[in-house]
A protein has these predicted regions:
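Extreme N-terminal tail/first-helix region
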Residues: 1-17
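Charged, low-complexity, helix/coiled-coil-prone segments
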Residues: 1-4, 41-58, 96-106
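Active-site rim elements
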Residues: 2-7, 89, 93-100, 143-147
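Structural signal for well-ordered, non-membrane alpha-helices
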Residues: 15-26, 52-56, 60, 104-118, ...
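Short, flexible helix-adjacent loops and helix caps
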Residues: 23-30, 34, 122
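Short, contiguous alpha-helical
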Residues: 31-82, 125-169
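Acidic/histidine-rich alpha-helical segments that form the ligand environment
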Residues: 79-124
């Protein structure tokens, strides 16, 4: 990304394409599992809500001077399967409308978070302790964490929900 505006534009573009896929899914089918896809529509959204919520929490906690535990206080990086199940248990019981609204709110908050940061804070290494602590060997700038929790999964999970729709609708 050349700057924060390009990052924000890619997040918006990816999110709008991703979230639109859910408009044609009836509420009654939100928990239907198909063999071809690893997540139901509700689980698909719960995963996105979970990661975007954590991303916002990492930044907010550091700003408040709270020690950040990545990926969360409850789980370590070698427990991602359990974390994903926690996302499902925590969020997927909500309606599709509620899930979409919650994710939209998180994406809006991430855009605001980006606006509040300087280009240096976003694109230079070692600008956030939580970003440094989250990776043992690699050096990740904050924008990479934003990308892998927004733009990247919005693309891959859009493919998954399209596959689910093809098998179900």
């Amino acid at each position: 990304y050349k700057d924060k505006e390009e990052l924000k534009a890619e997040i918006s573009k990816g999110f709008e394409k991703y979230i639109a896929e859910f408009d044609s899914i009836p509420e009654a089918l939100k928990d239907i599992r198909v063999a071809e896809v690893d997540r139901t529509p509700a689980e698909n959204l719960a995963y996105q809500i979970g990661w975007t919520t954590l991303l916002l929490k990492w930044e907010n906690d550091e700003k408040r001077g709270v020690e950040v535990k990545t990926p969360s206080e409850l789980f370590r990086w070698n427990q991602l399967g359990d974390l994903y199940q926690w996302f499902t248990d925590t969020y997927s019981h909500s309606s599709l409308v509620e899930l979409k609204d919650q994710l939209k709110g998180n994406v809006t908050s991430i855009q605001t978070m980006i606006d509040s940061m300087s280009e240096e804070e976003l694109f230079q290494p070692h600008m956030r302790k939580w970003a440094d602590d989250a990776t043992k060997t690699a050096v990740w700038e904050v924008y990479k964490f934003i990308h892998v929790n927004t733009v990247a999964p919005f693309g891959t999970f859009r493919t998954k929900i399209r596959k689910w729709k093809k098998a179900t609708l």
